[in-house]
């Protein structure tokens, strides 16, 4: 079985490295030539377009930045939809909203009869590399059962959440909402402690000994204090996801005040070219600057 991966960003890179490590036949298409050369040296087959990759893959995992990029690799002239491989299963890991995922799945089915599974994941590049993602899948159940063993290569948990494409994307956005708000709470706690004359490292040590600790406080806290914003998830992509959350809340006529405020803060932080390509936890630096004026 050949697994194609489209997208060589941070998450895609982690997935590819994991599959190569397990001895899987991996086909790769992406835009970063340096990464493509690296993967080729590791044993992956590199393709110049998505169509050719799709022709020679049994399953494709798509992992691109946004809805526009997803439509491009699916529907452009040399996109996946131009291939003749009618047995193809597409597992899309891109963070899009439920309507966008449903749009792609319907168009894929109507044009080619391919199977399209909405497959967003929780976890970052290191989790992917260790096979510790959490995969959330919605779409045709029989197709999910066919590829579950592939998802288990990169995941510690795989959840099938329903026949309707897009359901898993709604869960993903609701989960990512927690990332934004928890990171803001952690940032404000650090700032309050610091400006009260308390060593932020002491504050964080105590926090992480309580039930208030989170994966974010344990993984990111000390990096934030050191102003180390090496990205596992870009600030600009966090803002993109928050925008999707707010779009969903408006469609559902929901009032999400914390998410709305998060959107304002992350958007303001993202106005800095220097910050937008740093880790999302750089929101701490932004808030600290506001409190140092």
Task: Label every PLM stretch briefly.
Residues 1-63, 83, 94, 125, ...:
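NAD(P)+-binding Rossmann beta1-loop-alpha1 motif at the extreme N-terminus of oxidoreductases
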Residues 15-16, 104, 150, 192:
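Hydrophobic residues within alpha-helices
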Residues 26, 46, 115-116, 158, ...:
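Hydrophobic beta-strand scaffold residues
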Residues 50, 54-55, 59, 67-133:
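Rossmann-like NAD(P)(H) cofactor-binding subdomain of soluble oxidoreductases
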Residues 96-176:
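Rossmann-fold dinucleotide-binding core
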Residues 165-286:
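Helical "substrate-binding/catalytic lid" subdomain
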